[in-house]
Amino acid sequence: MRKLNNSATLTIMVASLILFVSTTVLSQARYPSGLLNQKGNFTSGAANAIGQPFRGLATSDGIIEGLFPIKETGVSSRPVREAAERFLATLNTAELSRSHFAINDPEWRHWSNVDVGIFPRWGISLEEMSGDQKVAAWALLEEALSAEGVEQTRSIMRTEQRLFELNGDSIRYGEEKYYLTIMGIPSEADPWGFQLDGHHLVINYFVLGDQVVMTPAFWGGEPVVTEYGRYAGNIILQEEQNLGLELIQSMNNSQLAKVVLSPDKVRNNQIAAANQDNLTLDYQGLAGSEMDSSQKLKLLKVIRSYVGALREPHAEITMDEIGQHIDDTYFAWVGSDVDDAVFYYRIQSPVILVEFDHQGPVGTLQKNAPGVPTRDHIHTVVRTPNGNDYGRDLLAQHLAAEH
């Protein structure tokens, strides 16, 4: 994999500082000092993480090589490429300067699941876009994502609107505070991609020829159920929640003894979100090889609820790759397995990592107890271990072949 030199690392940190300053100076009169301090902390944390050369998530045994060969899939990426070209054509010079980056730019790694009030983004937000630009942006997402993925994206944004209604903080919350950037030049043969980044919603989408990698991806939200307001009845991430519960409820006592890391869910357990590109994480729980055929199908169904956000047939290609490692796929659980339980689960194999976590409340303290995990706040993350988040393994192979 290519490493950043000291000059590149310094450039990243300076750029992050400029971004932090430029987005705070004009609005400091509106920012509470505590919020500004949080913003500085998140910006520094991202700069420090990005300053480390990318390795990828791996176990303590290190990176497994050769898992992600460049190959023909037979599935055209032309529709999403043309949609990206149409979106770029709507941007003026100033918008392009903050929304279009080189394919190997560290901007790929500059993302977070926290709100825009405490983590500044590059790119152009839906909030800033003209009507034509929004149409082009959504057309890009509709070509990249399945119908379910598009609806989940919209539903998470609607949840963000509910946070604004509950808290009245326009610096932090709003359904269009999501930023779009393009990486590389959309091409039939050369690598390119895009990133959508905002509160509880991050999509990194890499393309090389007809191969697609859509990780890291973060899907979350609070409140999970919108009871009142503009989008009353909006609900998110129930399939991911319920399928995980269905899988653990199928297990016998000897299996549960391996799966359950702790029966008590007392804190936030997610560990592989932002700034964790180089996380070392060993397998825990029950291996697929120790599950019966029905449980393996349930496990694949859980994984499919995440991978299915990717448009077919790219999703099916990804699922085929995951299925080849089903016996080496581990399932781990924290919490109870009763029907209304709060819990955390993790699915990990050489080619995928999924985390689901019921978290403590942040924006719904009006109705949820501080510090107590609730079904009303969900975080999920999907990663490609062993160096292929952001398609980095594919990119490295492509660049090596060019030389």
Model-based region annotation:
Residues 2-13:
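Bacterial N-terminal signal peptides that target proteins for export
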Residues 11-22:
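Bacterial N-terminal signal peptides
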Residues 23-27:
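Sec/Tat signal peptide C-region and signal peptidase I cleavage site
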Residues 28-90, 97-146, 150-403:
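A cross-kingdom marker for long, charged
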